[in-house]
Design a protein with these regions (language model features):
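S-adenosylmethionine/decaboxylated-SAM
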Residues: 4-178
Length: 178
């Protein structure tokens, strides 16, 4: 898989998905434009000062959480299958029954403990044959993400693949539950 946009080619129609960590909603738009989602949840606390770059880590921008929430809300206000939730990822995932989602994309704090928690909760909430993926698999810039993904992979004996053309790779787990 060349880039994270290609993930949508793996999705079935009528999927239920969520993006954990939304920033300005650019990747949310890619997911939505794929036409694969019956329900797409965009989850972010949108609080405080939020900093992010483009998908390759360049062009760093800093925004106020309230402004981002307002902007993302306006961007998707007429889309009836998008649900924007101001919540921490682990709180959001805990609400849903196990085996609910077809797709979960993680791009949040980049901290080891939080990423492990999100992966563990995602594994419970993802359906068999679902996809758990996430951004910023880059040893030099986001070593904690790399370590968390490798820990999760070993713990559950789950292989993963990486995008090949992104500077900040996306990791992809194709989930096969017993």
């Amino acid at each position: 898989m060349k880039n994270r946009e290609d993930i949508t080619n793996l999705l079935n129609p009528r999927s239920i998905g969520c993006e954990l960590g939304v920033f300005k909603g650019d990747f949310s738009k890619v997911l939505l434009d794929s036409g694969k989602f019956d329900q797409l949840y965009l989850v972010d606390p949108f609080s405080g000062s939020i900093q992010s770059g483009d998908k390759n880590g360049n062009n760093i921008e800093v925004h106020d959480g309230e402004s981002l929430f307002s902007s993302v809300s306006k961007r998707f206000e007429y889309v009836n299958n998008v649900f924007i939730t101001r919540q921490r990822s682990h709180e959001f995932l805990s609400i849903f029954r196990d085996n609910f989602f077809d797709f979960i994309y993680i791009d949040t704090t980049h901290q080891y403990d939080q990423t492990v928690l999100e992966l563990e909760l995602s594994y419970k909430k993802i359906k068999n044959n679902g996809i758990i993926a996430g951004h910023d698999y880059h040893p030099q810039m986001f070593g904690e993400v790399v370590n968390a993904v490798q820990f999760f992979s070993k713990k559950y004996n789950l292989p993963f693949s990486l995008t090949t053309d992104d500077v900040l790779n996306t990791y992809i787990f194709l989930i096969q539950k017993q």
